[in-house]
Amino acid sequence: LGLARHELGRTVWDERHLCHSPQERLFIDGAWHEGLLPPEDGPALRQQYQRFAARVAQAQRLGFALPTRQARWTPEHATLDAQTFAHWLDQQALTHPRLRWYLDYCCRDDFGADAATVSAWAGLHYFASRHGFHALGDETAEREPVLTWPEGNGWLSARLAEPLREHLHLGRVVLRVTERKHGIDLLAWNEAAGAAERWEARAVVLATPLFVSARLLEQPPDALRVAAGQLHYAPWLTANLALTGELLHRPGAPAAWDNVRYGAASLGYVDARHQSLNPSPRPPLLTAYVALPAARRRDLLEQPWQTWARWVLDDLAPLHPDLAPQLQRIDLCRFGHAMSVPVPGLRGSAALVALGEARGRVLFAHADLAGYSVFEEAYAAGMKTARRVAGGLGLAAG
Ligand SMILES: Cc1cc2nc3c(=O)[nH]c(=O)nc-3n(C[C@H](O)[C@H](O)[C@H](O)COP(=O)(O)OP(=O)(O)OC[C@H]3O[C@@H](n4cnc5c(N)ncnc54)[C@H](O)[C@@H]3O)c2cc1C
């Protein structure tokens, strides 16, 4: 995609796509602070940060990778997978409220659920598969680059799809997938024609969430039935807020790409114009993110948009008391099953492994196969399955 090139053994990223500085800030104790890690309020917190950093370094020696299935799976991993992250942290006496808030935030941001819900494997994977964890001032290596686009990961999927444009049949919702003796029948709803249509295929890759795949297949394999029963999905709400003018400056660090309030129910907001290279001033466009507990899925569906708009504005008000009067337009998007939550036992699920390794004419490729949801996992699942299908059909895979 032209995002990176290799020069003298180093990866050099195209700076237009790297998150511009300042990247993150946290509103705590009445002021903005650079970064999302709460500032130290005494030696007890520093000591806890350092102890957690040491535990993450230990976990890295055990082996964590992104995509996760590139790492080996040992009994130690299984032990971590069998308990919640909160339980594991309690056992380690890592209980400082500021550390726990930060770890909860990371889990809600990446997994859609807090440390009391996700497994200890997931909580450690967040750090150990990437840059580790460093107390303030202890950062050694350069941070891993963050790529971001105003349209989010839609930028990536649009460019990955571009070379295949002629082969894509969009605007169709698959209703049924039936394996026959010599092929596969698909029943799809064609949105433009307003009619159902039948397709025949030699092979099918179900790149749909596993709970959807389980409903599409007339005869889902046992592993799919089991896996679909093990998955828990987090509902999410996003809100795009178009403002009429700049917000008042609060004390501390300047506006960043990601802006979070300590203790908030939401995950804060990103500035959708942060990457803009257009020098002429334009009013802010903010995207707020909310990961809700599964118990609130029905509310998300049933409560009117005004209720959720109010919820978002109330949540952001302590950051920007002048936000509501500046609001020109708000666009809300509800995701009933936004991402699979890595609850205890899920990463080690034999059913997920079996689906990822499935042979035959119907194969599976979705981030769900990793037990949690990030772009890298979706990409890895897609590539792996594409190669297998191509091999089975005697085609070359790119
Ligand atoms: C609000 C939000 C923010 C996120 N932010 C990040 C981030 O910053 N970084 C990151 O790495 N990940 C992020 N994620 C997670 C990321 O979006 C997912 O990991 C990724 O989209 C998974 O890709 P996938 O191809 O496996 O599945 P999906 O993106 O779920 O794609 C499945 C596709 O199947 C289609 N489909 C479903 N049913 C049918 C049917 N019956 N017929 C036809 N098509 C069907 C769907 O429309 C969808 O297009 C975020 C997720 C959310 C919800």
Regions found by a protein language model. Name each.
Residues F64-R176, R180-G183, E200:
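Active-site/ligand-binding neighborhood in enzyme catalytic cores
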Residues D29, G35-L37, G183, W189, ...:
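Conserved flavin/dinucleotide-binding core of flavoenzymes
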Residues L1, H6, A82, W88, ...:
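Conserved beta-strand->loop/alpha-helix structural units within folded catalytic cores of enzymes
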